[in-house]
Amino acid sequence: TIDRFLTNDTHCDTYIGWVGSDFVEQGRRAAEAMIRESGGEGKLAILLGAAGVNVTDDRNAGFLEVLEAADTNIEIVAQQTANYIREEGQTVTEQLLTNDPDINHIYAHNDEMALGAVPPLKGFGKQPGDVKIITIDGTQGAVQGIIDGWVSGVIESNPRFGPNAMDALEAFYTGDGVPQVTIISDKEYTTENAEAELAN
């Protein structure tokens, strides 16, 4: 399978292995970026992906693991589902800022929700950089958001599964054996490399 694990206990005779990113590690790296960009202080809101999805659970678990272990003054004031959808990210962010205008950090489980958070920030008079947004995926829009100043960091979720998947199939058919799990590497986009990476 690619990008998603099998999620039930039913035996599958044709299952070979899995290729994808380590979603827990993505969350950990997002937390490290948040701590770095925030200076370890402030009010944080989390835009959660869809409930019951392993990516959502893993990205949140990794993030909270690092944040809770670190000696920071970052306060999580809200965790609300926005289902990986830009429009829901916008609606949820509007609600969160209405309830607490002092929110100055946002962790979004994906780029679409992060980009949806930008219009409400503008509507509340925020300037680029006033609210630190850390997100995961690595879409062009989010990397451009770093250049524009609205996004502080992006952890990539590498979409280039093809070569690894083909290597696994070739190994299977030649009898060389296939690993049960193949983790692909994910980049990190920051203010230091965003322009160069977007040009690639």
Locations of the language-model features?
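Structural recognition of the beta-strand scaffold that forms the well-ordered cores
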Residues: 1-3, 18, 43-48, 78, ...
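Flexible loop/hinge segments that line or gate small-molecule binding clefts
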Residues: 1-25, 36, 43, 139-147, ...
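Loop/turn elements at helix/coil->beta-strand transitions in domains of secreted/extracellular proteins
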Residues: 13-15, 39-43, 70-76, 101-105, ...
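Hydrophobic alpha-helical segments within soluble ligand-binding/sensing domains
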Residues: 18-44, 88-90, 114, 138-142, ...
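Short, solvent-exposed amphipathic alpha-helices that sit
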Residues: 26-30, 54-74, 88-92, 116-120
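Short beta-strand elements in bilobed, periplasmic/extracellular small-molecule ligand-binding domains
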Residues: 43-46, 67-86, 185
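Hinge/cleft segment of the Venus flytrap/periplasmic-binding protein
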Residues: 47, 51, 66, 70, ...
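Hydrophobic alpha-helical
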Residues: 63, 77-144
